[in-house]
């Protein structure tokens, strides 16, 4: 059993000496009544003193447990309930494109606070003030780069993708370091919880490099790669081939590393293929319900049911086109609520989360204009009958459970002695400098080198 598993307390045993019936009870003497009174008074004083000491050191955990959070709340005071939920459970957003917006508008320069007034306020969806107003508890910062401009470019063709990805990882980490009172860089689920208890927003990276701190990989973006078919490819009328043979090996290696597999942006067949291969729960970092809006970026109900079996989580996005493909201009916060409730109805409350895509879309729903609006979203869900416990699962507990489970599976795989995967994709090109004299490792080295040409 993982050390992360909650320890279940056994039922309280029946205490010996208690009368089993009224017939076994005999009134105490006056002397015993006096001893009992003194003993009870002493115990009451000790308990009161202990409680005061306990509350002194435990309750003031930053913004986590304020004195008012333990007071009863009117069940119809949805705003107060939402506030308490977000003060005690980290709301973790699965996808925010602020690092890419910084790239576009400041060329990744963040230290001049007049040119990038992150603390004073930005016109876009995310800044320090909005984060505090929205009670954000954790954020996966997207460090993606775009697909090549030339659609015919293959995976072996030279491009700037690796360079730019490394730059995006760098700027995201520097942004976190620049605002240490607000943000805290994390690579584990336990760190995310710890940061929240300190009143900081756990900050995680989402793309494709584990040793550089990245903790989830979106299998494709808006173009196919060596691993799988993208949703945009199918939307363009091309075949849905799903996961490639190399993609299957890729999934196994992600399981070994403990990286979360993100199925947003992939085709429907890729979703099904990955779910048939992975040993770890998956995430959809920013997708919604296909049953409610027939956009190929959304998740069909049969996949939602498979996610339930897999143990994963679908994090509902706020992109209007995904919420109402036939009328995106009319989308409001209530449409986001509808998608959350549908995913919860089909997959269960253990398998739904929030993945806004703030700062990655020019248009947002009315009522969900930026990061500060999370409390209102939770409030509306409570008005629709969602329980506090269900809301806690939605805002962060589900994602943290999935993350911890992926880590546990990786520990087990690595403890078994499984080596890193050495497979490569079909048609992989290798290059070698033919004019540089090198020693030979084998008798047939010359033939081996010709195969690289």
Swiss-Prot record:
It is a single-pass membrane protein. This is Putative dipeptidase UREG_03382. GO terms for molecular function: metal ion binding; metallodipeptidase activity. It comes from Uncinocarpus reesii (strain UAMH 1704). Hydrolyzes a wide range of dipeptides. SUPFAM superfamilies: Metallo-dependent hydrolases (SSF51556). Its cofactor is Zn(2+). Residues 1-33 are annotated as: Disordered. One of its GO terms (biological process) is proteolysis. Disulfide bonds join 147-223. It comes from the Eukaryota. It is found in: Membrane. Its main location: membrane. Glycans are attached at residues 370, 443. PANTHER family: DIPEPTIDASE, MICROSOMAL DIPEPTIDASE. Pfam families: Peptidase_M19. The keyword Hydrolase applies. Its EC number is 3.4.13.19. Belongs to the metallo-dependent hydrolases superfamily. Peptidase M19 family. Zn(2+) 2 binds at residues 208, 265, 286. It catalyses: an L-aminoacyl-L-amino acid + H2O = 2 an L-alpha-amino acid. The chain crosses the membrane at residues 41-63.
């Amino acid at each position: 059993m993982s050390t992360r598993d909650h320890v279940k307390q056994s039922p309280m045993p029946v205490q010996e000496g208690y009368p089993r019936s009224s017939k076994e009870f005999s009134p105490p003497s006056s002397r015993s009544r006096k001893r009992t009174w003194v003993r009870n008074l002493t115990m009451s004083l000790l308990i009161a003193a202990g409680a005061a000491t306990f509350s002194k050191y435990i309750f003031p955990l930053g913004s986590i447990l304020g004195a008012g959070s333990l007071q009863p709340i009117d069940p119809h005071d949805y705003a107060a309930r939402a506030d308490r939920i977000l003060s005690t459970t980290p709301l973790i957003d699965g996808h925010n494109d602020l690092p890419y917006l910084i790239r576009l508008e400041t060329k990744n320069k963040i230290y001049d606070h007049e040119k990038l007034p992150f603390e004073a306020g930005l016109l876009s969806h995310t800044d320090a003030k909005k984060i505090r107003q929205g009670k954000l508890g954790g954020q996966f910062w997207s460090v993606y780069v775009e697909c090549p401009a030339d659609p015919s470019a293959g995976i072996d063709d030279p491009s700037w993708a690796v360079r730019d990805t490394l730059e995006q990882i760098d700027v995201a980490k520097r942004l976190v370091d620049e605002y240490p009172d607000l943000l805290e860089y994390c690579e584990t689920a336990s760190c995310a919880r710890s940061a929240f208890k300190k009143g900081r927003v756990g900050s995680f990276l989402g793309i494709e490099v584990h040793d550089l701190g990245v903790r989830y990989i979106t299998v494709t973006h808006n173009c196919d790669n060596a691993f799988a078919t993208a949703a945009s490819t199918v939307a363009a009328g091309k075949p849905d081939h799903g996961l490639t043979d190399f993609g299957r090996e890729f999934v196994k290696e992600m399981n070994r590393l403990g990286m979360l597999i993100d199925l947003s942006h992939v085709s429907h067949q890729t979703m099904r293929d990955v779910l048939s291969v992975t040993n770890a729960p998956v995430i959809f970092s920013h997708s919604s319900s296909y049953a409610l809006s027939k956009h190929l970026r959304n998740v069909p109900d049969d996949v939602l049911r498979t996610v339930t079996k897999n143990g994963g989580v679908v994090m509902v996005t706020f992109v209007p086109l995904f919420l109402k493909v036939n009328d995106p201009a009319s989308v409001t916060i209530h449409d986001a609520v509808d998608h959350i409730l549908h995913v919860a109805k089909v997959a269960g409350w253990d398998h739904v989360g929030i993945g806004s895509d703030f700062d990655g879309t020019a248009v947002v729903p009315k009522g969900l204009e930026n990061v500060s609006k999370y409390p209102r979203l939770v409030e509306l869900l409570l008005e629709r009958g969602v329980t506090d416990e269900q809301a806690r699962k939605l805002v962060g507990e589900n994602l943290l459970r999935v993350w911890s489970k992926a880590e546990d599976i990786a520990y087990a795989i690595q403890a078994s002695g499984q080596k890193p995967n050495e497979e490569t994709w079909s048609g992989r090109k290798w290059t070698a400098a033919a004019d540089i004299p090198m020693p030979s490792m084998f008798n047939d080295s010359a033939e081996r080198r010709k195969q690289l040409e």
